[in-house]
A protein has these predicted regions:
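C-terminal amphipathic/interface module of NAD(P)-dependent oxidoreductases
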Residues: 93-118, 374-406
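Catalytic helix-loop patch of NAD(P)-dependent Rossmann-fold dehydrogenases
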Residues: 195-203, 210, 223-263, 267-273
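NAD(P)H-binding glycine-rich loop region in Rossmannoid oxidoreductase-like domains
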Residues: 158-196, 209
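NAD(P)-dependent short-chain dehydrogenase/reductase
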Residues: 252-302, 308-309, 315
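Glycine-rich Rossmann NAD(P)(H)-binding loop
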Residues: 295-301, 327-335, 388
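Mid/C-terminal beta-alpha module of Rossmann-like enzyme folds, strongest
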Residues: 313, 320-370
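Active-site region of the double-stranded beta-helix
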Residues: 1-36, 52-117, 301
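N-terminal Rossmann NAD(P)H-binding glycine-rich loop of SDR-like oxidoreductase domains
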Residues: 119-140
């Protein structure tokens, strides 16, 4: 059966035979029994189902979690119920039964394909984290993944959800978000931030709850006001700006989904535009004589989070079946200011860290032409909880050096 089903008999009696077609050690195991109105049986997804009616007028019923569709049929797997290797002792010889041509054509157990796992949908696949997740999937040869960005599935649009048969999906990894922190303080940006960061996750959480899907969602240090030097997963939200407020709202929605992982990160570095790449470019320009020096804020403290580590941590939680909930995830190591990280990048790139000068956040944005979102002073996240699952984050300084050498 593709579906999970609850089978009962209203009248009469049947002989039922079930073959486990799920991948793993139980593949090919057979279970048989007789059912009458006094008994019922639950059949998990991926277990082949067959029966014989033993009395005239037998009524045999299914309660299923999904219905047949052409898309569903593409995921079916079969085994031939006449295969002697199954050892099924049919009360009525199969030679006396009516079998469809499809039943007769089903493969023997030795040729049967294991039931494929439910699909995993990745949203926001073209962002920094989305690209890291895709790369992880490709490098590990994982199957059953579907990658979407806003052009193929805008998860913040309620009208787009009916396009999918959600019973086919076992997990959603939401890598999409609105991350223009300062632009979120504008009229246009505020609406966009709330649509992507609050409404979108709420819609994903609803569909995940309705279809028993595990939802993976990424949070931000901006849900806190930064007054505590170290933030654990139990700290109360106190976002300072619109971006942080919209992310906090999304977190609250996802937390109501029974099967969820929220990974809270800070200072994300991956493929594409980010702070480290900007500092590397500026270091090169200083080395080439195009710039004399640069200024970087020295009153915000935290740790970098590399998207390659985020992807590994996501699959670690999914694969190990860790307890659902919220997990902080950054690189480990001493907290540092943006200024200290910039000096490290300059020294690694061109040994010119002395050309980075410290400045306060207020001084840095003193001449800004547009709105500026308030930033948390302290963004360092406590990592004890995720380490308790067996995932040990890498040191940010070592990861930074490897990142610059890629």
């Amino acid at each position: 059966m593709l579906f999970r089903s609850y089978i009962s008999v209203a009248t009469g009696e049947i002989f039922g035979a079930w073959v486990d077609l799920r991948p793993g050690e139980s593949f090919g195991q057979v279970y048989t029994t007789r059912l009458d109105p006094s008994r019922a049986i639950f059949v998990p997804r991926g277990v082949g189902n067959s029966f014989q009616a033993l009395e005239d007028g037998t009524a045999y019923t299914y309660l299923v979690n999904a219905h047949w569709s052409l898309e569903q049929k593409k995921t079916y797997t079969f085994v031939n119920l006449a295969d002697p290797d199954l050892g099924i002792e049919w009360p009525i010889p199969l030679s006396e039964c009516e079998l469809s041509e499809a039943d007769k054509a089903h493969p023997m157990l030795k040729d049967a394909k294991p039931m494929a796992p439910r699909r995993t949908m990745v949203t926001g696949c073209n962002g920094q984290l989305g690209r890291a997740v895709r790369r992880y999937v490709e490098e590990h040869g994982l199957e059953g993944f579907e990658f979407n960005d806003i052009d193929t599935f805008d998860f913040s649009d309620p009208a787009q959800y009916d396009r999918f048969d959600w019973s086919l999906y076992g997990a959603i990894i939401n890598c999409g978000a609105y991350t223009a922190v300062d632009k979120a303080e504008t009229l246009e940006g505020r609406a966009a931030a709330w649509k992507a960061n609050a409404q979108g996750p709420a819609l994903l959480a609803r569909v995940a709850a309705e279809h028993n899907i595990t939802l993976v969602h990424v949070s931000s240090d901006y849900v806190f006001d930064g007054t505590h030097e170290l933030h654990d997963e139990t700290e109360t939200f106190a976002p300072l700006g619109v971006y942080g407020q919209s992310k906090a709202a999304g977190d609250l929605s996802v937390a109501n989904c029974p099967r969820h992982y929220i990974l809270r990160s800070s200072w994300v570095i991956g493929e594409g535009h980010n702070f480290v790449r900007t500092m590397k470019t500026l270091s090169d320009r200083v080395a080439n004589g195009e710039l004399a020096q640069v200024t970087v804020v020295d009153d915000q403290y935290g740790r970098l989070t590399f998207t390659s580590d985020m992807a590994e941590a996501i699959f670690h939680l999914l694969d190990t079946g860790a307890e659902y909930g919220t997990y902080n995830l950054t690189s480990e190591g001493e907290s540092a200011s943006w200024y200290e990280i910039a000096r490290t990048v300059f020294n690694l790139a061109n040994h010119n860290g002395d050309k980075v000068q410290p400045v306060t956040t207020a001084e840095y944005y003193a001449n800004a032409s547009g709105p500026v979102s308030p930033r948390p002073e302290h963004s360092t996240l406590e990592l004890t909880k995720i380490e308790g699952t067996g995932y040990i984050p890498a040191n940010w300084e070592g990861k930074l050096e490897k990142y610059l050498n890629m």
